[in-house]
Amino acid sequence: MKPIMKKMTASLIASTIVFMLVSCASKDSADEYDFSYDYRDDEYEFINDEAPESTEDFLADIDPVDLAPVYFLKKKGKKVSPREVTKIALIPRTNAVEFHFRDGANEVAVIWRKAERDKILNACKKFLQQYEDKTVPHVKISKKNAYFSSKCSLWFGLISTSNGCENNSYYVVPEFIEKKPYLLIRFSPTQTTSGQDTYTPKISLYMSPQQVRDFIEQMNQEKLEESIKENKKKAYTY
């Protein structure tokens, strides 16, 4: 049997070496971090420097925010009736606005990115100017006579919006109903991405001049960004 004192001495030497190595490692690790408690009280509640910059396709890395309802009209024969769209959300991660509503038997979701909203707002402003000048053109409802035509994401389904496409054709055009001008957003049937021979439904959203004014105000980019200001502050404030 080996002497106990030799075992203790060897253990003591080994422990001392380990302690010295750990101490050195701890010092090296601490030196890797740049930290300081030298800050002023008035530096609280500032936006973290690491918060991502807003762009045309990105506002913040936060969840969707519900927006106030938007009012359109639906047409039956020569009569129009209100169509209230209450499920509207701003998607900060893509700077898109989603509109969810029922059209006939279908639940429908229309998604407009900022570039599309800008086109629609420009058409709205042109329509209002023509309305005020009493120069709204009396034209046949068609893509050819539209203020503009483009594509957007549109999804639909009887229960959920599981069918549709990212490039649904639509256009914006004036239409007279009972001798009064309205602004029409017409979604044309477009083949879906489901792989089947199915098409999106034909959908018409009408707006009176006052509803056009309200739509312009609600879809104003500054107002949309204001709606997430408090959430963004909570998400990124130090």
Where on the chain are the PLM-derived regions?
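Bacterial N-terminal signal peptides that target proteins for export
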Residues: 2-13
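Sec-dependent, cleavable N-terminal signal peptides
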Residues: 17-18
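C-terminal motif of bacterial Sec signal peptides marking the signal peptidase cleavage site
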Residues: 21-23
